[in-house]
Amino acid sequence: MKTLFLAPTRNGVGLSSTALGLARALERQSLKVAFLKPIAQTYEPRTDDSVHFARAVAHLTTPDPIPLTRAEELLSQGGEEDLMEQVIALAREAAGEGSDVLIAEGLALNERNVYAGTLNARLARNLEADTVLVSSLAGVTPAELADELEIAAQGYRRSDGSGLAGFVLNFAPRELDFGSLMAELRSRSRVLASGELPLLGVVSLDPALRQLRTLDVARALDAEIINAGEAESRRVSSTVVTARSVPQMTNLFTSGALIVTPADREDVIMAAALSHLSGTPLAGLMYTSGSAPEATIQQLCEVALTSSLPVLRVPTNSFETASRLVHLDFRVPHDDPRRMDRMLDYIADRLDTVPLGARLRAPGVAGERRLPPSAFRYELIQRARAANKRIVLPEGDEPRTVKAAIRCTEKGIARCVLLAPPEKVRQVAQGQGLELPEGLEIIDPETVRGKYVAPMVELRKSKGLTEPQAEAQLEDSVVLGTMMLALGEVDGLVSGAVHTTASTVRPALQLIKTAPGSSLVSSVFFMLMPEQVLVYGDAAINPDPNAQELADIAIQSADSAHAFGIPVRVAMLSYSTGESGSGEDVEKVKEATKLVRERRPELLVDGPLQYDAASVPSVGRSKAPDSPVAGRATVFIFPDLNTGNTTYKAVQRSAGVVAVGPMLQGLRKPVNDLSRGALVDDIVYTIALTAIQATQSAADCG
């Protein structure tokens, strides 16, 4: 195992987010990453920021750091060796077994810990680590930056010239002339000119990643929350301090705007209320000077002021409030994992870690490829981009769907087709402060519905479908989208944000039909567990499959796992393991396991297995010592829908695990259902899944 030590060159360079972003980038290369913050950053008793987010967002198991007070006590008493021994013990605990690389984050530099630079160098040396320097372009000239990197590198460079893994530059302006910058840096720094300190990445400023939630602003200003609304999810992208008349300010009442006003500005309050009711998701309305609007105004605007619009009150006047807003702390609070997750993805996307990853891999060790969650998501998006498929979204004016389609179009994940009146889609986008990208296709169902009547009658002629019946059914946008898929005009369909599962699946069964060799349609969820991605099937479609159907589900799920790069070890689940139980339910699982082995002898499959015997190595060794699957299953096949759906939701909620899916299996062409509570990210990943499935379907047909 190799160790990387991340060290800052000065204060405020984004050390913690870079450390965790690097961890994510290396995980995408299927390296098993461990994380360590050896010494706590502050004297506060709360969990260190980087440790908290390593656990909560990066899903890395890491021990608590040595308290800063204890470290300083040891250093002041000449106990540096004792301190280093404790650090090494922590490193071994953090690395555990089988890790490819340990990322250790040093101490950030500040005016209190003047010793941090020297201590960081000693930590790196004692951990036998290669060092990644983290620096910033903020507030320095290229010449100053070159000198800073050269001096810092000398503190971590070993006598044989090794010890430097590279450097990362944060807070780069978007208009940076990269070529000129690197030329000047290399002209002044020997370690840069020689290549001893390679550049790992330049991370530009992204204002969206600095956006605090309305709740964060309320906490920082000690504001009274009059109406919480969606304060936990809305983000402040701009602040509007009302000093002018309303007609001169309405153009500022945009998505993410925080309206700061005295409570006696009834015109501003009513304008904010109207803006909210028209669909603009303002970040909030803040009354200054500890005041409240007149009762008549509150009554007039009651619908807006008691709904999802956050309403706050602060004791300071507007000028003082505006001044405090300018000086807010933009660090990510512990209860905002979504923002940190986006930040880590943003950083990982901008790090070139392929050469570094090659160095970190132990030569000559051929182990099974792991697929941690971040690598799964990354590869999902990359493969979808490569597929370049056209995906129809029948719920074309649903806000989450519109936002997901915009994101997919901008990132090149898929060529999305929204089925909805174009004007309505534009209104939905504007209400969310979004612009429709040029490549996003919008089709008005009213203008195309008629051309699908005859083809639909032909497809359903064996069922006696008439033209009037077809016309009536095509009023449903899901049916219309399914016909587009049946005729090959699109490559896949995603629906379910507002429609039921039956509304999505039924037209597919009638018009798309099952794939050759498939006797049924089933589903899987990709469970993004902290260590790896697991497959759960079927947790969405088949209520009580018989043995033959259960075997089909297992084979379909195994093939899906393989298609997405997940090692296939299938556990046929039951309430008993091996021969310990009996009864109709157990016999069904035994028979299904037998059928899978007969039909696909190359698959690693075993059952019946209890969930703990399938997933926990120690339990698997105890209950099924001869099983090739017990304790290390990756594909979990549930005996019925009740068990599968309950388990998936329990794991998802109790363990905070992201579940991607359900992904439908067994159809001739890909159709996927969404949960009606799906988030925008869920829809994006489902679109990506569908695009990849479309590639596989085309290959199977070809």
Curated annotation (Swiss-Prot):
Catalytic activity: acetyl-CoA + phosphate = acetyl phosphate + CoA
Gene Ontology CC annotations of this record: cytoplasm
Name under which the protein is recorded: Phosphate acetyltransferase
InterPro entries documented for this protein: DRTGG (IPR010766), P-Actrans_bac (IPR016475), P-loop_NTPase (IPR027417), P_AcTrfase (IPR004614), P_AcTrfase_dom1 (IPR042113), P_AcTrfase_dom2 (IPR042112), Phos_Acetyltrans/Butyryltrans (IPR050500), PTA_PTB (IPR002505)
Subcellular location: Cytoplasm
Native organism taxonomy: Bacteria, Thermotogati, Deinococcota, Deinococci, Deinococcales
Region (Phosphate acetyltransferase) residue spans: 375-702
Name of the encoding gene: pta
GO molecular function: phosphate acetyltransferase activity
UniProt EC number: 2.3.1.8
Keyword line: Acyltransferase, Cytoplasm, Transferase
Organism field: Deinococcus radiodurans (strain ATCC 13939 / DSM 20539 / JCM 16871 / CCUG 27074 / LMG 4051 / NBRC 15346 / NCIMB 9279 / VKM B-1422 / R1)
Domain of life: Bacteria
GO biological process terms, semicolon-separated: acetyl-CoA biosynthetic process
Pathway(s): Metabolic intermediate biosynthesis; acetyl-CoA biosynthesis; acetyl-CoA from acetate: step 2/2
Domain notes: The N-terminal region seems to be important for proper quaternary structure. The C-terminal region contains the substrate-binding site.
Keyword RNA-binding on entry: no
Function per UniProt: Involved in acetate metabolism.
Broad EC category: transferase
Family (UniProt): In the N-terminal section; belongs to the CobB/CobQ family.
Quaternary structure annotation from Swiss-Prot or TrEMBL: Homohexamer.
